[in-house]
């Protein structure tokens, strides 16, 4: 790591969290690592009570002060049930919410904030706070470089594709942007060039792409060698651009418990399976396919005879075919939670079946495991396209939805056929590059030192 200068005694960093989906956990991981490296700096971590309670444990560094903030939902207001409604209410209220809480935290700690570290989605709150406090703004983008490119060049994409003509051009590639030659229009996130471009969320992400070049630094959970074209471009677009991942590999041994939480015995089960034979299926709690597709997954697994571990919420298990669990008891296991990183890194793991969220993709890359992707929303489609067409380490499920036959064919292709073997080779090459990036003198290791300087010593 590039050795940072000695932190000043009055360093105080505000960490503003976007408390939805999987955004909060990586930013907490970065904050913990920064706090460990700079013990004299106070990090005030702002998120909603619900987000904080689901993430935080007693073993976070003592120089992290946790603050619960309002969720932006007016008192007595009844949400529609659409998750995006809660997101939009929070985004609209965020600047005032964080302004109020930041002032209170400064009084409590007795130190002025010198740096505002935020999720990039909170660009407006960040710029507002940074300007008022004359503090630096360091932004964390929670996706990959390809999806960030779509946001950074939204205006160029709209101009070249045409918002009104987009329906006829969905299959065309975005070759007019360097590095996007294999990305199709339909792979971009909703709100870039199709969908409701006037929604609060779409406007927020559009403006985020315009605001990020004004940040003191932008960092992502990735590594330079995965997307070298984008890395070079971002270095000219941003004041400072830092890849500091994969975060799962960057954790030091002292931060990682030797005791793995595995309440359902997944690791003992996988020990008995042959090399590269197991399918791991997991979609998390935010984006699970509909019941009819859960049935198709179950049918495909049972018919294929592929050994499997399926992490599925208990409430979703009621949708599985009658008798499925009994009939496949020797073939696999369905559990409400599984130690994902440890499973992916086991030599018996053959394929990761996921929605293609960035954290899942990077964990699969870090473990050298091919993927079967079923995009659901957000950046899933653009990540899945990168998996299939750019890095060639997996496939996207045919027709975009799970069917019994389609899933069985995908399993066979990845686990048995020759092109699946090539995917495995490509995935292992990326795993090696990821390991090199986080090693001493590796690009991500050095970049974390740069991030530490930006956050603690303000560049």
Curated annotation (Swiss-Prot):
Its EC number is 2.4.1.-. GO terms for molecular function: flavonol 3-O-arabinosyltransferase activity; quercetin 3-O-glucosyltransferase activity. SUPFAM superfamilies: UDP-Glycosyltransferase/glycogen phosphorylase. Gene3D superfamilies: Glycogen Phosphorylase B. Keywords: Glycosyltransferase, Transferase. UDP-alpha-D-glucose binds at residues 338-340, 355-363, 377-380. It is an enzyme of class 2 (transferase). Disulfide bonds: none annotated. Belongs to the UDP-glycosyltransferase family. PANTHER family: FLAVONOL 3-O-GLUCOSYLTRANSFERASE UGT76E12-RELATED, GLUCOSYL/GLUCURONOSYL TRANSFERASES. Possesses low quercetin 3-O-glucosyltransferase activity in vitro. This is UDP-glycosyltransferase 78D3. It comes from Arabidopsis thaliana. The lineage of its organism: Eukaryota, Viridiplantae, Streptophyta, Embryophyta, Tracheophyta.
């Amino acid at each position: 790591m590039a050795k940072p200068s000695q932190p000043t005694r009055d360093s105080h960093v505000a960490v503003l969290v976007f408390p939805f989906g999987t955004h909060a956990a990586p930013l907490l991981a970065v904050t913990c690592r920064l706090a460990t490296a700079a013990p004299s700096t106070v990090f005030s971590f702002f998120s909603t009570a619900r987000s904080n309670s689901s993430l935080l444990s007693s073993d976070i560094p003592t120089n992290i002060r946790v603050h619960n903030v309002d969720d932006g939902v007016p008192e007595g207001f009844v949400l529609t049930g659409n998750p995006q409604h809660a997101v939009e209410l929070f985004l609209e209220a965020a600047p005032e919410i964080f302004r109020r809480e930041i002032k209170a935290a400064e009084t409590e700690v007795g130190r002025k904030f010198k740096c505002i570290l935020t999720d990039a989605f909170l660009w407006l709150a960040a710029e507002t706070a940074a300007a008022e406090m004359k503090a630096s703004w360091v932004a964390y983008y929670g996706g990959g470089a390809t999806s960030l490119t779509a946001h950074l060049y939204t205006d160029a994409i709209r101009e070249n594709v045409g918002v009104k003509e987009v329906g006829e051009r969905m299959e065309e590639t975005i070759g007019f942007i360097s590095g996007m030659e294999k990305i199709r229009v339909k792979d971009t996130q909703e709100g870039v060039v199709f969908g409701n471009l006037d929604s609060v969320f779409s406007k927020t992400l559009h403006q985020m792409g315009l605001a990020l070049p004004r940040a003191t630094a932008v960092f992502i959970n990735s590594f330079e060698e995965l997307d070298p074209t984008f890395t070079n471009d971002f270095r000219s677009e941003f004041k400072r651009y830092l890849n500091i991942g994969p975060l799962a590999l960057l954790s030091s041994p002292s931060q990682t418990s030797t005791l793995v939480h595995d309440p359902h015995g997944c690791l003992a089960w996988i020990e008995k399976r042959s090399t590269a034979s197991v399918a791991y299926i997991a979609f998390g709690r935010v984006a699970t396919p509909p019941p009819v597709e859960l049935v198709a997954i179950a049918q495909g697994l049972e018919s294929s005879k592929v050994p499997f571990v399926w992490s599925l919420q208990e409430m979703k298990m009621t949708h599985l075919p009658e008798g499925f669990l009994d009939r496949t008891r020797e073939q696999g296991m369905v559990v409400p939670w599984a130690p994902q990183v440890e499973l992916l890194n086991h030599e018996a793991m053959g394929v990761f079946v996921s929605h293609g969220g960035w954290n899942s993709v990077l964990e699969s890359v870090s473990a050298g495991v091919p993927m079967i992707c079923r995009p659901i929303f957000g950046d899933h489609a653009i990540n899945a396209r990168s998996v299939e067409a750019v890095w060639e380490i997996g496939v996207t499920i045919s027709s975009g939805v799970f069917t019994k036959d389609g899933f069985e064919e995908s399993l066979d292709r990845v686990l048995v056929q020759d092109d699946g073997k090539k995917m495995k080779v490509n995935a292992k090459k990326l795993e090696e590059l990821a390991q090199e990036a986080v090693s001493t003198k590796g690009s991500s290791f050095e970049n974390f030192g740069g991030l530490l300087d930006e956050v603690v010593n303000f560049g």
